[in-house]
Amino acid sequence: MTPTHPTVTELLLPLSEIDDRGVYFEDSFTSWRDHIRHGAAIAAALRERLDPARPPHVGVLLQNTPFFSATLVAGALSGIVPVGLNPVRRGAALAGDIAKADCQLVLTGSGSAEVPADVEHINVDSPEWTDEVAAHRDTEVRFRSADLADLFMLIFTSGTSGDPKAVKCSHRKVAIAGVTITQRFSLGRDDVCYVSMPLFHSNAVLVGWAVAAACQGSMALRRKFSASQFLADVRRYGATYANYVGKPLSYVLATPELPDDADNPLRAVYGNEGVPGDIDRFGRRFGCVVMDGFGSTEGGVAITRTLDTPAGALGPLPGGIQIVDPDTGEPCPTGVVGELVNTAGPGGFEGYYNDEAAEAERMAGGVYHSGDLAYRDDAGYAYFAGRLGDWMRVDGENLGTAPIERVLMRYPDATEVAVYPVPDPVVGDQVMAALVLAPGTKFDADKFRAFLTEQPDLGHKQWPSYVRVSAGLPRTMTFKVIKRQLSAEGVACADPVWPIRR
């Protein structure tokens, strides 16, 4: 460890003596000292339940609550590994994620998605669990000696195959993100970090929660992002820094503009996948600096915008990052779309848990393959051009198409299904599905919507926004669906298209 390369445990150490700063949540405030103590009690209670012969992995299926944050503290203190579980996943899909990550049990709350019946889980809002943790309230707070390479957390994301992968996030990866953002914006003890992005996502953990710990200021947690309450929360908690991923800037900008919007304490906002025009508009309207970066949970390719980066560009390509032809691996000429790769190695990618095949594919030939498409201009600035493979970016979440297709194939009138992205009018993608119906049947949008509602393993973000009904799907000679053609034709195709109301 060095002053600029601490572990997460070392970030938390000074917080254990702080009483005048801490965690804000709704109408409550908990000092850092008490929050760290709560984490120690949770760790002790969990240790009594965990089998020491198995990986100490604990699934977390919670909204942004102090308990979620305290569970991250518990992990840093004890070596227990929190596993962020995405509530978009349901039923057998969620059970598969839990099994893939070797979770011994899952922490849920009153607002959590339903956990499969055969999975051991704890309702952290229950009186029984509250008493169980309270029994350890006098547990001595001990800061274990962690190594930078030690596993801190597993965070699920979707890969090119559509199947979720558990990304390994070490102490180094999480802590250095917090330190970097703290230094970039000169954050300190007087700052309040507003975290409304979901803590099961890497964005909230790395550039939200870890930033609050690194700057030794305070953190304000929002259970679930709300555009209408964003400015009210900033003023209520005195928030000076906030993070985002995807559309939140656009959602906030869509709220009615008032003359005093810039009268607020917010001074810095950091995130990724913001709409270029909205980044500037947000900064002007609310009187703050907005910096939009490019990266992923894996962390193999990261691009930082500079002050002279053109509008719409990701930033200049760093050393070792190239845009190559996905088929040949040769560098692409200026203006030609190719895959972003890291030729220097894995970068910040630390591997997938329990998925050697996916990890080998990601690092084929010793090169990190991001699965993201881009092109560069004459000055060397990169521009995002979509995603290679079978996945979509919807409302800040990576969604695989295969799990959605498996659900839609249950629709009784469908004989063939293809799911693919179409551009969202604001940012990212919308889900579109092409169906081939059984002979003698007609598409009924109300019937289809009722079917979607009844599917226990289909989250709302996975619902198709549009359904195309076709006589047949375009296929290759090896019978694979040509999804790039479907995506290119979009909603303006020759076939009938129905919008599906969520």
UniProtKB/Swiss-Prot annotation:
Statement: the UniProt record of this protein carries the keyword Transit peptide: no
GO CC annotation terms, alphabetical: cytosol; plasma membrane
UniProt KW keywords: ATP-binding, Fatty acid metabolism, Ligase, Lipid metabolism, Nucleotide-binding
Source organism superkingdom: Bacteria
General function of this protein: Catalyzes the activation of medium/long-chain fatty acids as acyl-coenzyme A (acyl-CoA), which are then transferred to the multifunctional polyketide synthase (PKS) type III for further chain extension. Also involved in steroid side-chain degradation. Activates cholesterol metabolites with a C5 side chain, including cholate and chenodeoxycholate.
Record family assignment: Belongs to the ATP-dependent AMP-binding enzyme family.
Name this protein carries in UniProt: Medium/long-chain-fatty-acid--CoA ligase FadD17
Gene that specifies this protein: fadD17
